[in-house]
Design a protein with these regions (language model features):
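A short alpha-helix/helix-coil micro-patch that ends at or immediately precedes a cysteine
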Residues: 1-32
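Short, functionally important structural connectors and interaction interfaces within domains
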Residues: 6-8, 12, 50, 74, ...
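Secondary-structure boundary/capping signal
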Residues: 13-14, 39, 87
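Residue-level signal for pocket-adjacent positions within structured domains
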Residues: 9, 40, 53, 77, ...
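Short, surface-exposed glycine/acidic/tryptophan-bearing loops
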Residues: 22-66, 82
Length: 109
């Protein structure tokens, strides 16, 4: 879905990154306890791996990929991440706690 949007806007597709998936799993789990771009330990979101992470989109409560991507595209800051030409890698992870789904999308260059 993200790549369809990027390509429709004249951008190259982002490629899956296993390394970014590791960071997105960490962030998805962290936001179940503190929904913020600040990590539960008080550090910035990108400190999971500052050598890889250059953009982040978070969401909670959406049940489908279409719903969460549509919500991100309706938000100027999240949309800017999805459409940033410099980003060429991406990973998205989800986790569910107490019936609520949390999403972490991490971008790299």
């Amino acid at each position: 879905k993200v790549n369809e949007i990027r390509m429709a806007n004249g951008l190259s597709a982002v490629q899956y990154s296993a390394s970014l998936e590791t960071t997105s799993v960490v962030r998805a789990n962290e936001i179940t306890t503190k929904f913020s771009h600040t990590r539960p330990d008080g550090t910035d979101w990108y400190t999971v791996n500052a050598n890889l992470q250059y953009g982040e989109n978070l969401a909670e409560g959406y049940n489908t990929a279409d719903d969460v991507v549509n919500a991100w595209m309706a938000s100027p800051t999240h949309r800017a991440n999805i459409l940033k030409p410099d980003f060429n890698t991406c990973a998205i992870s989800t986790t569910t706690q107490n019936g609520r789904t949390y999403w972490a999308q991490e971008f790299g260059i």
